[in-house]
From Swiss-Prot:
Name this polypeptide is given: Efflux pump periplasmic linker BepF
Gene Ontology terms: cellular component: periplasmic space; plasma membrane
Record keyword Membrane present: no
Protein source organism: Brucella suis biovar 1 (strain 1330)
Predominant localisation class: periplasm
Encoding gene per record: bepF
A biological process term (GO) from this entry: response to antibiotic
Induction: Induced in the absence of BepD and BepE.
SUPFAM superfamilies: HlyD-like secretion proteins (SSF111369)
Assembly and binders: Probably part of a tripartite efflux pump, which is composed of an outer membrane efflux protein, an inner membrane protein and a protein that expands the periplasmic space. Could form a tripartite pump with BepC and BepG.
Length: 411
C-alpha cells in the first residue's frame, strides 16, 4: 500500500494541472479527461510492477554421511538355535528280576566306567547257579559212564560177542550224554551271567541322575530304568540349518558341509560366551521335509561341565578363511513394496534409490549380492532428511567412526 501511494504521488507531480498558478492550463472537464487516462495507466503499471512475485533463493545441498562401497575380506558368520546333547546317554535297566539290595551312589554325582551303582539280591540266582553246577557234574558223570560202555562194546564187537546193533546203541547213547553235558554247561554259564547281572555298573564315565526305585523294590527288565547316566565331556550341540542357508553357502562353488572351514562358538542363555570352541563332526544326509532343515552337529570340550544335556544355546558358525564381499550396514537398508533398497549418491550429487538383493546377515552388516558396485556411495547418516532426486553434500564417513567400523566385522 505504501508503494502504491508513493507511485501515485510521483505521477501527480508530473501532471500539468498539479502545478498551481499555471495560467495556460485548460479548465473544466475538457482539460482533465486526457490526464485521467494517463494517470490510470501509470497507476496500473506501478501496481503490476510491485505485485510481481519474487523468485526464492535455491536451498543449499543437505549434508549427509556416506560410505564408499569396497570389497572387504570378511569372515561370514551365521547364528542358529542349538540344543546340547550328551555324546552318550543310557537308561540303567535291571536285566534279571530281583529285589533291589543296595544303591551305592549319590544322586547327581559323577561316575566312572565300571563303578558299581546298584546291587540286586543274589540268593535266588546263586542257588540257580549251584543247581546248574550240579546238573553239569551229573551230566558229565553220565557221559563218562556211557563212554566206557561204548569202548567195552567195541571190544566185544571185535570178538564177535555182541552185535552191530548193540554197538550202535552204545555209540548213540554216548553222543546223547555229551549233548546233555553241553546243555548243562550252557545252563551253568547262563546262571553265572544272571548272577553277574545283580551288580549294575556304569558303562561309561559321566553323571548319574535320580534313582527311580528305592532299596527293597522288586525290579526287572519290564520295570523301567533304575536311573540314567549321561556323558559330559566331550559333548554335542545339534542345530538345524535351513534349506535357504544351505543354498547361500553353496554359492560360488563352496560346500555347505565343508567342516574344515567352519569354527563354531556358543552363547549361553545368560549372554555369556562359552570359552571353548567346537568343530562340526556330522552333517545330515537329507533335508527334513517337515521343517526344510538339515541337522548339523558340533562337538565341544566340556571340562567344567558347563554345558548340560538338553540345554538351549545360540550357535555361531563362522568361516575360518576370509571371503571378499560387499557389506552395507543394516541401518542403511530400507524396504518398500519392491523390496530392499538403499539411498546412494549419483551424478551431480543427487540422491538415487538402488534396489538391492541381500545375502547373509552377520554382525551389524548385510552382504549385498546385487544392486551395488565397488565405488558406489551409500548414505548411512541423514537418511530421514533426504529423498530421491534431492541434491546433497556427501561427506565420506571416516574409517574410525562406528559406521565405518561396522564394515570391518570379522577382520
Amino acid at each position: 500500500m505504501v508503494a502504491f501511494w508513493t507511485c501515485r504521488n510521483a505521477w501527480f507531480q508530473h501532471l500539468p494541472f498539479a502545478k498551481r498558478g499555471d495560467e495556460n492550463a485548460p479548465s473544466g472537464p475538457r482539460r482533465l479527461r486526457p490526464w485521467f487516462l494517463v494517470l490510470a495507466l501509470g497507476l496500473a503499471a506501478c501496481s503490476e510492477d510491485k505485485s510481481a512475485p519474487q523468485q526464492a533463493a535455491p536451498l543449499p545441498p543437505i549434508p549427509v554421511g556416506v560410505i564408499k562401497i569396497t570389497e572387504r575380506p570378511t569372515h561370514p558368520q551365521l547364528s542358529f538355535v542349538g540344543r546340547v546333547e550328551a555324546t552318550d546317554s543310557v537308561d540303567l535297566i535291571a536285566r534279571v528280576d530281583g529285589f533291589l539290595d543296595k544303591r551305592t551312589f549319590t544322586e547327581g554325582q559323577a561316575v566312572k566306567t565300571g563303578d558299581l551303582l546298584f546291587v540286586l539280591q543274589k540268593d535266588a540266582l546263586q542257588a540257580a547257579l549251584d543247581a546248574a553246577q550240579a546238573n553239569l557234574a551229573k551230566a558229565q558223570a553220565d557221559a563218562d559212564n556211557l563212554k566206557l560202555q561204548t569202548e567195552r562194546a567195541r571190544s566185544l564187537y571185535k570178538q564177535k560177542t555182541v552185535s552191530q546193533a548193540m554197538l550202535d546203541d552204545r555209540v548213540a547213547a554216548e553222543k546223547q550224554a555229551l549233548a546233555v553235558v553241553q546243555q548243562a554247561q550252557a545252563s551253568l554259564e547262563q546262571a553265572q551271567i544272571n548272577l553277574g547281572y545283580t551288580d549294575i555298573r556304569a558303562p561309561f564315565s559321566g553323571r548319574i541322575g535320580m534313582a527311580n526305585f528305592s532299596v527293597g523294590a522288586l525290579v526287572g527288565p519290564s520295570s523301567g530304568p533304575l536311573a540314567t547316566i549321561v556323558s559330559q565331556d566331550p559333548i554335542y550341540v545339534t542345530f538345524p540349518v535351513s534349506d535357504k542357508t544351505i543354498l547361500d553357502l553353496t554359492e560360488g562353488g563352496r560346500t555347505a558341509t565343508d567342516r574344515s572351514n567352519v569354527a563354531v562358538s556358543l552363547t549361553l542363555s545368560n549372554g555369556m560366551t562359552y570359552p571353548q570352541t567346537g568343530a562340526i563332526d556330522f552333517t545330515g544326509i537329507k533335508i527334513n521335509p517337515n521343517t526344510d532343515t538339515l541337522m548339523v552337529r558340533a562337538q565341544f570340550p566340556n571340562p567344567n561341565n558347563v554345558l548340560i544335556d538338553g540345554q538351549y544355546v545360540q550357535v555361531t558358525a563362522a568361516s575360518k578363511h576370509p571371503v571378499e564381499a560387499l557389506l552395507v550396514p543394516q541401518k542403511a537398508i530400507m524396504t518398500d513394496q519392491s523390496g530392499n533398497y538403499v539411498l546412494a549418491v549419483g551424478e551431480d550429487n543427487k540422491v538415487i534409490q538402488r534396489q538391492i538383493t541381500q545375502g547373509s546377515t552377520f554382525g551389524s552388516n548385510v552382504v549385498v549380492k546385487s544392486g551395488l558396485a565397488v565405488g558406489d556411495q551409500v548414505v548411512v547418516d541423514g537418511l530421514q532428511r533426504i529423498r530421491p532426486g534431492q541434491k546433497v553434500d556427501p561427506q565420506i564417513v571416516d574409517a574410525t567412526t562406528p559406521a565405518q567400523k561396522a564394515m570391518s566385522v570379522g577382520n
